[in-house]
Curated annotation (Swiss-Prot):
Residues 156-169, 220-235, 247-259, 277-286 have a biased composition (Pro residues). SUPFAM superfamilies: Endosomal sorting complex assembly domain, UBC-like. Its main location: cytoplasm. This is ESCRT-I complex subunit tsg101.
Amino acid sequence: MYGHHGYPMHAHQQQMVNPTLAIVDNKMHTLSTFLNYIRAYRDPLRISKDLKETFHLFPNLSPFYENIPNRVNLICIKGTIPICFKGINYYLPIIVWVPLNYPQEFPTMVLDPTPEMRIVKNHHHVNLQGLVYHPYISSWSSNSTMETRVSQQQQPQPPQNNISPPPYGSSPTNNNVAAQQQQPPPPYGSSPSTSNSSSYTQPPPSYDSIKNKTNNTSSLPPPKQPQTSPPPPPTQQQQQQQNNNIIPPPQQPSPPPAYTEPTAAKQQQQQTSPSVKPLPPLPPQPVIDKKSEMVDQCTIKLQELLSKFYDTTSLEIKDFEAHNKSLEELSKKKLLEKEELSNQLATYNSQIDQLNENIEQLEKWINENDKSDSNIDIDQILGPKDSLSKQLLKLVSDDSTIEDLLYYLDKALHSNRISLEEYLKNVRSLSRDQFIIRATVKKVQFIIRQNQQQLQQQQQQQNSPQRQQYNQQQYFSK
């Protein structure tokens, strides 16, 4: 396991401090807030439970967030995990991405090397991009846990350095250093020892075969941040207690670690560094409060119910708003129709009043002219009423009379009843009278025609408002 900046650390100095309950609760509070904010995960309770156990088992892991646009919001935990190889412990910086369908889909683990580290080529479990593959993925199920997935990376792996890493804080002899320098590292892809090969005969699947199974978020980790120094390592007793809690992985050949040290100067510096005294043992870890876990679960459940209630209520409110808008439009239409009906009602009432007046006038005239047949004077009834009509009737009758006289005088002349002198004398006199009568008839007709035109104009002026009202009624009815 690599320590700060990838330097190897000795086992007795790898004392990882167990986090207190307050630190774990703080991390879980941050994750719960994030889960309630995005509301995208299928099983947030299972995620909270597994992450809490992971934080207890690996205190160096912490939630990591980064505001990156146009990317799915996924939970990410970042930190270092310890591995032990040949009595030397190393800290490996990793990033773990939790998919949306967890635990149906396995989490994605990516190595996060510092600038001083490099990834070994053709590694069995790590590609050049840092994506980690482990045989535990091939057997992943919904019952698998995240802390077991991370624990698989703690298995001993032989380092692939040009010089074997010395124990941190110790000053080995020159013979040991020379022996270490002369001992070549195991080549990549070399077969493991006989004891290991008997327990794991089938090699793990390649990275290309498992790459298709991972989701899109596994190949797009967020930008890296500077690696922070790990917390103090735990004591040997605490390390042994943690190892007892870890689920043992299946036996397999140990591939080389993903990182190698670029220079040997840092290794010499570690060899010459003085030994560091182990830290005193820490007090026992406090008991986890189950009541707080239940409160957190209840809070998450209530927030889910509130979210569902908010969604359904918002949809109902939108439906009610649309219904209210339609009702307002209908009310406006009803008001317009009511105004039109009131105007039509006023017009019809005025017409009814006018018809009643006409009916009264007709009844009055009928009562006045209701007489018996014996008292009726036909000449008075059928004769003209005004003086001009009477004069015109008399003139027309005189003109017809003169026409008859001229006709009979003409017949008397042909039958030799009268002489020619008498005929001419009578014709001259009657013609003069007929001319005067006809001229008077034309004057009387002209005066009567003028009176009729004036009467028609007066009637038209009286009927024009009624016609306008009638036209308006016809227009609105259309």
